Amino acid sequence: MNSIEFPLLDRTTPISVISTTSNDLSNWSRLSSLWPLLYGTSCCFIEFASLIGSRFDFDRYGLVPRSSPRQADLILTAGTVTMKMAPSLVRLYEQMPEQKYVIAMGACTITGGMFSTDSYSTVRGVDKLIPVDVYLPGCPPKPEAIIDAITKLRKKISREIYEDRIRSQQGNRCFTTNHKFHIGRTTNTGNYDQGLLYQPPSTSKIAPEAFFKYKKSVSSPELVN
């Protein structure tokens, strides 16, 4: 495991008094006691079972899983995020106290994964909803990769300046947006439907009921204009 940068010592005295800055001391205390909120929706989340065991034992890094976002300062998102779950994820993030961090784990969380090509309900990347500090690719990532991602996050925290992070968060607010269609193949014919174009949220006029239209001659729903 990579070494972590601890607070820089300004000076020491013969009576064992250490002098440092409040910012460095705060960073060191936070990186040594990260309390994660585990947000798992599919198979990537199963890898956390290996971390809990004695072989990896992520408790030794000061990680204490919490069930409440108000007690957590790190949220680990693993698995596919759907449009129905997006408001709940944003609400959990907003309920976390400052300073708070996000690790996006797995291809489905980062880009939508294999569901991003023809699924109307999949969010193409969790960073469209909340700011992400560390991206962890893989399908699924190994437990060693998860530990490495946590190590990189701890290094990032050790070099952090509190005022800069607050200023960045004030200028980049997160919010939910409706996800729109790309041009895709219909369910039955395999032909491209030119009516379902990808448009910005402000200009899209496609009504939700127009996405699926049932016909008596079709056994399954078909995308129509």
Curated annotation (Swiss-Prot):
Reactions mediated catalytically: a plastoquinone + NADH + (n+1) H(+)(in) = a plastoquinol + NAD(+) + n H(+)(out); a plastoquinone + NADPH + (n+1) H(+)(in) = a plastoquinol + NADP(+) + n H(+)(out)
GO MF term list: 4 iron, 4 sulfur cluster binding; iron ion binding; NADH dehydrogenase (ubiquinone) activity; quinone binding
GO CC annotations, alphabetized: chloroplast thylakoid membrane; respiratory chain complex I
EC number: 7.1.1.-
Topology of this chain in the membrane: Peripheral membrane protein
InterPro entries in the cross-refs: NADH_UbQ_OxRdtase-like_20kDa, NADH_UQ_OxRdtase_20Kd_su
The UniProt record lists the keyword Methyltransferase: no
Record GO biological process: aerobic respiration; electron transport coupled proton transport; photosynthesis, light reaction
Major enzyme class: translocase
Keyword Lyase among record annotations: no
Top-level lineage group: Eukaryota
Protein localization: Plastid, Chloroplast thylakoid membrane
Cofactor(s) needed for function: [4Fe-4S] cluster
UniProt KW keywords: 4Fe-4S, Chloroplast, Iron, Iron-sulfur, Membrane, Metal-binding, NAD, NADP, Plastid, Plastoquinone, Quinone, Thylakoid, Translocase, Transport
Cofactor binding mode and count: Binds 1 [4Fe-4S] cluster.
Signal sequence residues: none
Chain positions recorded as [4Fe-4S] cluster binding sites: C43, C44, C108, C139
UniProt record similarity statement: Belongs to the complex I 20 kDa subunit family.
Subunit and interaction comment: NDH is composed of at least 16 different subunits, 5 of which are encoded in the nucleus.
Function: NDH shuttles electrons from NAD(P)H:plastoquinone, via FMN and iron-sulfur (Fe-S) centers, to quinones in the photosynthetic chain and possibly in a chloroplast respiratory chain. The immediate electron acceptor for the enzyme in this species is believed to be plastoquinone. Couples the redox reaction to proton translocation, and thus conserves the redox energy in a proton gradient.
PANTHER family documented for this protein: NADH DEHYDROGENASE, NADH DEHYDROGENASE [UBIQUINONE] IRON-SULFUR PROTEIN 7, MITOCHONDRIAL
Protein name, UniProt field: NAD(P)H-quinone oxidoreductase subunit K, chloroplastic
Species whose genome carries this gene: Populus trichocarpa (Western balsam poplar)
